[in-house]
Amino acid sequence: MKNREDITNLLNPRSIGCELGVFKGDFSKVLLDSGKFDQLYLVDPFSGSIQSGDKNGNNIEVHDGESLFSSVSKRFEYVNNVFITRQRSHEFLSIFRDNFFDFIYIDTTHQYDQTVLELELSYKKIKNNGIIAGHDYHPQMFGEVVNAVQFFSKKYNLPFSLTTDDVLNTYIFLIQKQ
């Protein structure tokens, strides 16, 4: 898989998905434009000062959480299958029954403990044959993400693949539950 946009080619129609960590909603738009989602949840606390770059880590921008929430809300206000939730990822995932989602994309704090928690909760909430993926698999810039993904992979004996053309790779787990 060349880039994270290609993930949508793996999705079935009528999927239920969520993006954990939304920033300005650019990747949310890619997911939505794929036409694969019956329900797409965009989850972010949108609080405080939020900093992010483009998908390759360049062009760093800093925004106020309230402004981002307002902007993302306006961007998707007429889309009836998008649900924007101001919540921490682990709180959001805990609400849903196990085996609910077809797709979960993680791009949040980049901290080891939080990423492990999100992966563990995602594994419970993802359906068999679902996809758990996430951004910023880059040893030099986001070593904690790399370590968390490798820990999760070993713990559950789950292989993963990486995008090949992104500077900040996306990791992809194709989930096969017993």
Can you name each region flagged by the protein language model?
Residues 4-178:
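S-adenosylmethionine/decaboxylated-SAM
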